Design a protein with these regions (language model features):
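Amphipathic, well-ordered alpha-helical segments in soluble domains
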Residues: 92, 122-125, 149
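Donor-binding/catalytic cores of nucleotide-activated saccharide
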Residues: 1-116
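C-terminal, non-catalytic tails of nucleotide-sugar-dependent glycosyltransferases
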Residues: 121-141, 181
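Membrane-interface aromatic/basic loop that binds lipid-linked glycans or pyrophosphate carriers
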Residues: 128, 158-183
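Amphipathic alpha-helical repeat scaffolds of TPR domains
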Residues: 143-155
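Active-site catalytic microenvironments for nucleophilic, acid-base chemistry
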Residues: 84-85, 129, 156
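Residue-level preference for long, well-ordered alpha-helices that form the structural scaffold
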Residues: 115-119, 163
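Short, charged, amphipathic alpha-helical segments
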Residues: 117, 139-145, 167-172
Length: 183
């Protein structure tokens, strides 16, 4: 995709995967190890729906819809399931078909009260699915996913407008949560 910066400069941003067709064996080998979350605490290569095209039959066959309990970052859970079910996909590396503009009000950049609860729900729903699959062990990625969102939420608390005491209280609640302890 084309990343458009605030001052108007732009550059081509690509995923750290090779261009071309991925069959199920290649998906298991190359994509599954980072499907949900990479070791570097970055999203997996398929976790944004805005840079993927899906066949309607595929979505219907696997009953893929957005999780109505996950209000923010819902493309993460959707794309993790889609990536798991995919028998193949084709990556057009080097094609800037989408222009991504910086938006300071997005959930990834702005504080949202209740975001931690939403992310815990998302992680719980991911566990409900991936804990029952047998062809790959996603447990470490699920833990990294929880750690990523804890860091994300704690970083955004500083933008909340809350007092320093309230910010500390919110951060302690996240740090002491059972969900993070299990990660």
């Amino acid at each position: 995709y084309i990343r458009v910066l605030d001052e108007g400069n732009q550059y081509l941003k690509t995923l750290d995967i090779q261009e071309g067709r991925y069959d199920k064996a290649a998906i298991r080998e190359k994509i599954f190890p980072q499907l949900i979350m990479g070791e570097n605490l970055e999203y997996g290569p398929l976790l944004s729906v805005w840079h993927c095209l899906y066949r309607t039959e595929f979505l219907k066959e696997h009953q893929l819809t957005f999780d109505e309990e996950v209000r923010w970052s819902e493309d993460n859970i959707f794309s993790a399931f889609a990536g798991y079910y995919a028998d193949s996909f084709y990556y057009l590396k080097g094609e800037g078909l989408y222009h991504y503009y910086n938006n300071p009000g997005t959930i990834t950049t702005a504080y949202r009260p209740g975001a931690w609860n939403v992310y815990c729900t998302m992680n719980r729903h991911l566990h409900q699915f991936f804990d029952s699959v047998s062809e790959y062990d996603f447990q470490r990625q699920l833990k990294l996913h929880m750690i990523f969102y804890a860091c994300n939420c704690m970083g955004q608390v500083g933008q909340s407008g809350e007092s320093k005491e309230k910010q500390m209280e919110i951060r302690k609640r996240i740090l002491n949560s059972q969900e993070l302890k299990e990660a």
